[in-house]
Structure formats: C-alpha cells, structure tokens
Regions:
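Peripheral terminal and linker regions in Fe-S/redox and tRNA-modifying enzymes
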Residues: 1-589
Length: 589
C-alpha cells in the first residue's frame, strides 16, 4: 500500500503545485489549512520551497536549481539582492549575522527566513535572470552535479557540459517524471579528478575510453546505486556500460524511467535508488534497460580514469588538491580562481561583492563546487593579481588553512526539522580553535572535516577524513548536543566510508578529541603518509585510544540547546508565526 506522501503526490505534484503555492502566497500564511500543512509543505518541496522547523512557523527556505553549479552573468547578483531584501529573519545568528546565502554540497544555493507572501516577487526577480527553484527538492531529480569547470578545465578528458544541459532540459524538465519514488541524484563529469563524486549518486557518468570500430572513443562509463544517509551508504556499482556523449542522455533517461516504473513506493526507509540496485542487481538492470528502455546496443564498459582521481581521495600532497580552490589555468588561457568559504555561508553583502568581482575581473560568470565554494571564471592573466588583492579574498582566501579548506557542514538545527545539533556556527568556531591550537606537518595539505546534523548525512560526514554526525548526550545531568566521530572516509578510485570510533561525545569535548587524534597522527605517521592512509594502517583500538575526548578552553556556541529552543541562539519565546511584514500573528487574528 503506498505511503501517505505517495497519496499526496497522486493528488497533486510537479508543475501544478506552483499555482496553488502562488494562491496561498496571495492569501497569506493563514490560508493554508492547519490540518493540511504537512501535505502542502511536502508538495511545495518540488518547487524548492521548504518550511522551516518547528517554532519557526510561517518562515521558509528556498533552494535553487542550477545544474553543475553554473551561474551565468547577473544571476549571482540577483540571488544576493534577494537575500538582502527578503532573507531577513527575526533574530541574528551570532556568527554570521543575518541576510546570507548557503552554498550546498550539490552545487546549488539556499535562502532562509523567507515569507510565503514574498515568494511570488522572489520568483519574479530570480526567473528574470534565468534562475529557477523548480525540481530542487522533494521526490524528484535534484540538482544535477558535475565538474564546475566543465568546458574550461585545461586537463578535461571529455566535455560533459552539453550532456548536463541536455539532461537538465529534457529530463528534469519533464513533468511526467516529476514524482519519483524518492529523491534521485544524477552526476556527470568528464574531468580526471572525480569531483562530481559519481560514487555517491543514484546514477553517475564517469570519464572513460573504449575502442569502437577501430577508433579510440572518449565517453562515459555508467555507475548506479550510490548514496549516503541512514548509516547505510552504498558505493555506486558499475553497470558495465560505456556510452558516447551523444547517447549519454538516453542511458540516463532509461535508468530514471526504470526506477520511476519499478522503484518501491511503499517503504520510504528502503526506496532510495541504492536499495533498488541492491534488490535488482546490475545484471538484471542492464538486461532490462537493453530489452525495454533503449533502442540501441549497450556497449560494455570502457577503460575508466578512476586511478587518476584526486578529489577527496586521501592522496599525498604531490598528487595535488584538485578541489578547485586557488588559481587554475583554463583551456582558453584565461584563469579561474576558487575561493574557500568555510561551511558555505556568504552574507548578502559578500555575495553581491563576489558578483562585482566576477564582472570586473572575469566574464561575470560564477561556478559552485560540491565543497560549498564559489569560483570566479574567465579571468584574464593580467587581472588575476587584482582579483587576488580584493578585500573579499582576505576573508575567503584562495589559499586557506588546512582545516578551513577541508570543512563542510549541513544546515543543522538552525532550520532543519531532522537535525539533532547546530552545525555551521559550531564548525566555524571549531575551525578557529583548531587553527590556533593544532599544528600539522608541513606536507599535510588537507584534512577533510565534514559535519552532518543527523544521519541523513547532507554534510557528507561518511566521506570525510574525520566526519561528525549530530547526536545528544547527558553531561553533568543535563542534555547536551553531542557528536559521533568517524574517521577514514573518502572518494577517489576506491571510495570508503568512515568507521565510527567515538559515539555521543559532548560537543565541547570534540575539539580536544581532534587535537589528541591529530597530534597522534603527526607523531606516528610514516613520512608522506596522508590521514586516510594512516587511518587505514592503524588499528581501530589505537584510533579509539588516540581520539580521547577532552575539555579545553574551547567555548561551544550552543552546547545545551539540544533543539529545546525555537532557534539555537535564542532561548526566548518564538515570534512565529508572523504575517507578511514579520509581525507576530496572535491567536485572535
């Protein structure tokens, strides 16, 4: 029997939801019947509109959809202006202030504290420059990820941008496929670094070559059934298919349709595509695709480039960082400059400043990476130094510290109904403490620190050198925010997921744990050994011993909140719900 969300989707989903959302926006928050709010909030997600967590009633988040992290000239500025004019909540975050944007791990952008009544104006402003929020959430195909410098990468193996554009336009734009069994992630990359992380997507196209009719043809191998979340991660498995670029869309569509037709619509705990691949197996899937979903012969897999992957691969410094941060030459002789934005949060002012810099020193275009960082592209060589001297780059540096460079964090309890802990402000404070209190050998260039507020793992803790997932614990008789700590994750040629070595560590003891663990790494590693290599070579018992929790002078920003307040940094009474002007709505209104 289908679950209730399937019943809701059968009643209305996809493009038709937009008109109803606009109707509610015109009539105001209170026009949504209270006993129907869960249903409408679930439907709104298709249009990237998410209601905030309990205690923040009438406030919404909007997630945008920009395939492959592409922001054309004028788009980032419009987003920054929307954040400035509309993303202003009733309280300030003590770490970030108010009016900001969040860069995501799928190369998109999220705006918070939006009022339902403002959404029509917000859509009008964004859509005027070609920015949409359609298909950015819910049970649908999410933002398609890829190499952010596709078509510009000097060392690119095959240009994936045309494939990405075709999939986005024809597949994600197809309303008949809007209601998938569950959210579905697609990645396509033609680069040699593996930065699109094909291993953790529902379907991923990776660069490959194959001899076809005595020609060495470049194209893609196909992997299916990858993903994180629920402490049940899966590596995407080879479908044993090689596809040329002009057939790539057809193969992706075929697998999407197969999952659409046959995916589990009853048990939401077991209906992600990774479980579908578990149940069916790649041989059966390949056979059915060939017989019923494509009208051309599926070739066997070609030679992949996985051994070259360096993106979050735990490889030595001499292999390169390949996270797109820093100054890099493009194929046309111009350059792109990648900024490091800790935890992916830019103020509205910084966002507009970044758009100014892109206009002044580049083509105006900006790209977003899967590490929550922006790239200014198309910078002539004689403009690079001027860009590097810009004040904004003193804050978001192209050559950041080891810890800052590797940090990512999800939304956390600030807004998310699933999260158990605050994430972004805590990570920012921890990064400052680590920079001041932990020294690493000169040849250690990266430590990936990923923080997810719950086991859904939107912050990709499972693929970190050191991953954190939010929990709760008791300390001195009081409920506090706590973290599970895992080590040894990564992507690369052979993806691995963290081993959880400490559970429910009070958040104020985690920095001390990190210092103890990293000092042990520095003391016991072999020359040139990366953290991931050291973890692989060190027994679990020793790792647990090294990772001893410890209280230090670190002051946690919201240790005792444990989601007991309406906002992690305000234990007063919630002002929500509010009207279109942000004024509280009384029970008598």
């Amino acid at each position: 029997m289908p679950n209730k969300k399937e019943a809701w989707k059968e009643g209305m989903y996809g493009d038709e939801v937009r008109e109803k959302l606009l109707e509610f926006a015109e009539e105001g928050w209170e026009s949504i019947p209270e006993d129907e709010r869960d249903m409408w909030f679930s439907r709104f997600k298709f249009w990237g509109v998410f209601h905030h967590r309990s205690g923040q009633e009438s406030y919404f988040m909007m997630r945008l959809a920009n395939t492959n992290g592409v922001l054309e000239p004028g788009q980032l500025r419009a987003i920054g202006e929307v954040a400035r004019d509309y993303a202003d909540g009733p309280v300030e975050n003590p770490e970030f202030g108010d009016t900001w944007i969040d860069l995501t791990t799928r190369q998109s952008i999220q705006l918070h504290w939006l009022k339902l009544e403002d959404i029509p104006e917000i859509w009008e402003k964004l859509e005027a420059v070609g920015v949409s929020s359609r298909s950015a959430g819910g049970d649908t195909m999410r933002n398609i990820s890829g190499c952010p410098v596709a078509g510009r990468d000097k060392h690119e193996f095959v240009d994936s941008q045309p494939v990405l554009d075709e999939i986005s336009t024809k597949l994600r734009g197809d309303d008949s496929l809007a209601s998938m069994p569950r959210k579905f992630n697609i990645s396509v990359t033609g680069c040699r670094e593996g930065c699109a992380q094909d291993s953790i997507n529902g379907i991923g196209l990776e660069p490959a070559a194959k001899a076809v009719d005595s020609r060495d043809v470049r194209g893609f191998n196909v992997r299916v059934g990858g993903g994180l979340g629920g402490r049940e991660p899966r590596r995407a498995r080879s479908l044993d298919v090689f596809v040329e670029p002009d057939r790539a869309y057809d193969v992706v569509r075929a697998f999407v349709e197969l999952y659409f037709d046959n995916g589990n619509r009853e048990n939401r705990q077991k209906n992600r595509s990774r479980f579908f691949v578990d149940e069916w197996g790649t041989e059966r899937i390949r056979d059915l695709l060939q017989r019923e979903y494509v009208d051309f012969e599926l070739r066997r897999a070609g030679r992949n480039l996985r051994e070259e992957y360096t993106y979050n691969a735990g490889r030595p410094a001499e292999a390169g960082k390949h996270d797109h941060v820093g100054v890099h030459e493009q194929t046309d002789g111009r350059y792109y400059v990648g900024l490091s934005v800790p935890v992916g949060r830019l103020t509205a002012t910084e966002t507009i400043e970044l758009a100014d810099l892109a206009d002044e020193h580049g083509s105006g275009a900006v790209r977003l990476t899967r590490r929550q960082n922006p790239l200014v592209v198309d910078v002539p060589e004689d403009e690079v130094d001027a860009l590097l001297d810009a004040e904004l780059l003193e804050t978001h540096r192209p050559e950041p510290s080891v810890f800052t460079r590797g940090a990512m964090a999800c939304t956390g309890t600030e807004f998310c109904s699933l999260a158990l802990t605050e994430t972004k402000a805590r990570m920012a404070v921890m990064l400052r403490w680590l920079r001041a209190n932990v020294e690493l050998p000169d040849d250690v260039s990266q430590i990936k620190l990923h923080y997810s507020g719950c086991t859904a793992d939107c912050g990709q803790a499972m693929t970190a050198d050191i991953g954190f997932q939010g929990m709760r614990a008791r300390k001195n008789g009081e409920m506090v925010e706590a973290l599970d700590v895992g080590v040894g994750g990564g992507i690369g040629a052979e993806p691995s997921f963290v081993e959880w070595i400490r559970q429910r560590v009070p958040a104020d003891e985690v920095p001390g744990l990190l210092r103890n663990l990293l000092e042990a790494f520095a003391a016991h590693r072999e020359a040139g050994q990366t953290f991931r290599q050291w973890v692989d070579a060190t027994g679990e018992e020793s790792l647990v011993e090294f990772a001893e929790p410890e209280e230090t002078d670190y002051e946690d920003p919201c240790l005792t909140d444990a989601k007991q307040s309406w906002y992690p940094f305000d234990d007063g009474e919630s002002p929500a719900p509010t009207d279109a002007r942000g004024e509280p709505i009384s029970a008598d209104d």
